[in-house]
Amino acid sequence: MKKILVLLLLIFSSMAVFSSDLIIDSKTQTFSDKEKKIKLDGGVKVKLDNLTVESEKADVTIRRNNKLDTATFYNKPYAYEINANKKREVKANILKVSLINKVVRAEGDAQSVITEGNTPIVTINADAQEYDIKSSVMVCTGAVTMKYKDIDTYSDKAVIIADEKGGLKKIDLIGNARVKQENNESEGHHFVYNPITEEMSVSGNTKTVALTDDGKKLTIHSDYQQYSKKQNSYIGSGHVKIWFDDYFAQGPKVSVFPDAKTGKPNEVYFVGRSKIVQQDKDIIADKIKMTMEPKDFQAEGNVRTIIHNIETKDQEDL
């Protein structure tokens, strides 16, 4: 009876500290004064604000001031948060919920799914995921994969920021990052994606491969790249190199625009002292425009052409 009274006092005194309601349900609840833990078994269900966590087994650690600290859920627990018509679900081997800081940490085969209505819009898998309920910021680490609409990503780390309605506002992919969207694949050290404007930037040894309608590859290497899905355009800067068919071009800055009819990447503009190589010819100029269909290029400003391996032979005296 004494332990039950102590348990109730701990829960209610902690709820007085929180600015939100904390509800703990389970088949059995015991308090260990030696371990400073509340142990929960059977049908465990904890509700904090909009967050609900369910598992078969859990424990709650107690601080020295007898306030509830961290709730740990075992045996593949399940958590969910409902915000308007969006639902965030989290599954993992272990879930840890900081009752003071309102941070949820998922460890081991962690998966988060955000649905709008009945439609999944985001699925994230990682070794570990940490979600701050107050700031709506999620940090994922370890073999992070994400599917967002038509975008598939991989990275060592990801930081996802949601808006007040639960929708995505910003996605950061950090370390060995790769992104695939339709026929385009990109890689680099750091990706930043804005789901609202559908614009993406990538820095650090970047590479993009875009497929044309006839299956040919347009490959872009640079220090920095920016992509707009709405305009289907690319901007690259810093040691830019481009390969297409038998063309190779390089320069300090490039812009790639789509064909007005097909919407596919077709026009490439180099600005600054640039060079284009085709077979045995090098053309160097201040500006170079290259088109892929029909395949052609134009060079302007201090143009120099170098033709390699010209064959010559001595004429015989008549």
Where are these regions (language model features)?
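Mature-chain termini and adjacent capping regions
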Residues: 1-318
